[in-house]
C-alpha cells in the first residue's frame, strides 16, 4: 500500500480533514479535530500511526515486526504500521476503520449525528 492510497482511504471517511504537522513531518487525519491517523515516513519507509485498544496494540506488535509503538503518541494505544511490510492491506484498512470509529465515539452526540448525514 502506498501513502497516497492510504490517504485517499482516510479522506473518504465522513468528516475527515487533513493537515500537516510540520514538527513531525507528518500528515494528520482528523475528524472534528480528533486525530485518527498520522501518516509519515519512518526510517525511510511509508507508515501510519493508528489508535487501537492497548490489548490489540500489544497483540499486533507481538505478531508483526512491522507494527511498533508510535514514537510521538501514547504508546499503549497508538501503533505505527509500515505500509510496505507484512501486514495485509485489508488489515491496515480494518485498523484505519477502527481508529476512525474510536475518534468518532469521542465526539459529542450532536456531532456524531451530523457525520451520519454526510
Curated annotation (Swiss-Prot):
Coiled-coil residues: none
**Transmembrane ranges?**
none
Q: Which InterPro entries match?
A: YjbR, YjbR-like_sf
The name this protein carries in UniProt is Uncharacterized protein YjbR
Species source reads Escherichia coli (strain K12)
Record lineage: Bacteria, Pseudomonadati, Pseudomonadota, Gammaproteobacteria, Enterobacterales
Amino acid at each position: 500500500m502506498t501513502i497516497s492510497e492510504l490517504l485517499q482511504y482516510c479522506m473518504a471517511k465522513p468528516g475527515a480533514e487533513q493537515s500537516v504537522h510540520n514538527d513531525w513531518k507528518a500528515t494528520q487525519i482528523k475528524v472534528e479535530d480528533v486525530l485518527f491517523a498520522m501518516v509519515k515516513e519512518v526510517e525511510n519507509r511509508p507508515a501510519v500511526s493508528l489508535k487501537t485498544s492497548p490489548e490489540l496494540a500489544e497483540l499486533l506488535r507481538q505478531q508483526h515486526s512491522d507494527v511498533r509503538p508510535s514514537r510521538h503518541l501514547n504508546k499503549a494505544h497508538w501503533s505505527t504500521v509500515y505500509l510496505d511490510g507484512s501486514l495485509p492491506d485489508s488489515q491496515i484498512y480494518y485498523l484505519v476503520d477502527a481508529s476512525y470509529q474510536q475518534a468518532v465515539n469521542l465526539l459529542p452526540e450532536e456531532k456524531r449525528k451530523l457525520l451520519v448525514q454526510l
